[in-house]
Amino acid sequence: MSCGDSGIRRILRASKRFRSTKGASKARRDQMNSEIRNLRALLPISPEHRLSYLHSMSITCTYIRKSVELRGVCEESTVFSAVNGCVPQDCALQDCALQECVLQECVLQECVLQECVLQALPGFIVAFTTDGKLLYVSENVHEYLGLSMVDVLQSDSFFDMLDRSDVEAVRSVLADASPSGERWVVCRMLVSKAMRLRSSCCPLLVRIRLRDGVCVSLCRPTADRLPARNADFHTHHSADMRLASASSSVLFHLGFSADELIGRSWYELLHPDDLRHAADRHAAILAAATADAEMLIRVQCKDLSWVWMYTHASATAERDAISCSNYMISEAEAVYLQQRLSSSSSSSSSSSSSSASPQCSSVSDSSDAHSAHTLFCTPPYSPTSSQCSDFLSEGYGSLEALVDSAFCSPPYPPLFPNPCCTPTVCPPDTALDPARLCPPDSALVPAALCPPDAALDPTQLCPPGAALDPTLLCPPGAALDPTQLCLPDGALVPAVFCPPNGALVPARLCPSDAALVPAALGRPDAALVPVCRPLQVCECPLDGAVPLEDLSMFPLPQGGGSRLMPPEASPTTHTHFSYDAAQQAGIGTLAMQIHTLICSFDAYSAARHTHSHHTSCWAPEPLLDEGIIDSILRELDSTHTDAHTLI
């Protein structure tokens, strides 16, 4: 045996003397368990919990963290401060037995008080740091999550209690939380296996308040998951939703006493934007379409403020009375409930439409989707909200439709019988004052000018309808030579030409070589159609005079194929009006008489309507009234009688 082997054996024998034995390991574990039991005894937890060593260590760590974070805050509310207040100063340190008895009594009172407070709370309390480390969880958490306080504290972080999809939303809320304000957020929390069979997550409304770097939150289920016994107040209504009775607690939420509400209609308290939604739910209940209904509405308080309220309404079997459980909610909860109710409406409509025929399913899906989208159209209240939106939606159409029906485009004179007017054909023995047709600044010409080689579509011409009154076209001014408007086979004078859309443009944009062509020569009812050349800006004379060549007959393009004007009836050469001196004098006299009569009526109209902006170029004519007209008629009758007498 070598020396090396003997040395190794000596080392091994020496190490066996210092190696831990089975008894030493057990003694060490017992010592650790004893320390853990001592720590567990200091925890404010009932011995009935029978915590494991691992649970005890995790809760101990949480308790130490809470004591460190709330140092100086908890000293004012500890049991020892209560003991010091209860025990007299002279015996507080002398009689240790008395101090212990008072301590036990205070602990018992605190436990009873804490139990009463937890029972009165609408949820459970969670305290955690801004980075999510848990500091405190109330014992009534098992009523909402199915998990005990000890199980919740094993996670060590508040974010471990949340659903993964809501973690970032809660983090952003905590980052934006002001030190002195409150934040509301709806998030989903993980539940026990038994509750998970009913729903994967439990949506809770978390009301967070930040104080001294500690977030204290009150977590309670959303209003749609609360039982009826936990409603803020109950109301009973008749079939027309008049209040028959109300809980006394309505005074704390709306400011009205129960006696003030009895006999009033429920709709008087609702926001105008929520009336339709509430009426639809009300009608569905009365029609026995559903056993109960959920409503998300805004209610006006006595101080004229608006609050969100979730109402669960149900009718009796006879449908003669309706009971409502009302829950006051925050705006954050209202947004969540609005989304949930909208999604449930969409899902129910899609399931009902799936059983219908394929042709009807597409129509019902679109209509149901639209109804689900507009079911909860309740934006945040503004003072400008009124019932005008409901008024328009009841059958009067949208606001744009009312505006379109009230204001046409383009505007037309008030006496126009139709937006599109037709040319007027004068008899051969009458003439129209040309000065009424072509004023220097406001003449009416076709808005759509066509190229010279384009044929006119018959649909572009105005249908034969109400003729335009010539007096509406322009004010009296700038008379033209009446001989320039006379045609060889009779005076054919157009009143106005309208484009297809009825738009009228000033005469300054009319090309100087545009002329009027008769549609069918020789026909007494032939209408005039415009034949326009390329648009050229021309300057109209200030006196309104139009050169003779501008009113000449312009030949139509050959081969145009117009159905309105046969080729054989179209002029082929430039022809001017040719009348002898006697004819021109007679026509001029007749035109002057007509012009004088028109000016008299214009003056009478201007006296009645002071808003007229046109003034006459001629000297003011005497105003014609009914007396003057009667005297003229009597004079004509007397002249006619004298003529017969002479005969």
Swiss-Prot record:
Specifically expressed in endothelial and hematopoietic precursor cells. Disruption phenotype: Loss of most endothelial and haematopoietic cells and a significant increase in cardiomyocyte numbers. Embryos show defects in the endothelial and hematopoietic lineages at a very early embryonic stage, characterized by the absence of the endocardium. Early cardiac morphogenesis proceeds normally even in the absence of the endocardium. The myocardial cells form a tube that is demarcated into chambers, beats rhythmically, but exhibits a reduced contractility. Mutant embryos survive for one week of development. GO terms for cellular component: nucleus. It holds the Pfam family bHLH_NPAS4. It is found in: Nucleus. InterPro entries: bHLH_dom, bHLH_NPAS4, HLH_DNA-bd_sf, PAS, PAS-like_dom_sf. Residues 30-67 are annotated as: Helix-loop-helix motif. Keywords: Activator, Differentiation, DNA-binding, Nucleus, Repeat, Transcription, Transcription regulation. One of its GO terms (molecular function) is protein dimerization activity. GO terms for biological process: blood vessel development; definitive hemopoiesis; endocardium development; endothelial cell development; endothelial cell differentiation; heart development; hematopoietic progenitor cell differentiation; hematopoietic stem cell differentiation. It comes from the Eukaryota. Residues 117-181, 238-274 form the PAS domain. Heterodimer; efficient DNA binding requires dimerization with another bHLH protein. Transcription factor specifically expressed in endothelial and hematopoietic precursor cells that acts as a key regulator of the endothelial differentiation cascade. Acts as an early-response transcription factor that regulates the expression of early regulators of endothelial and haematopoietic differentiation, such as etv2 and tal1. This is Neuronal PAS domain-containing protein 4-like. It comes from Danio rerio (Zebrafish).
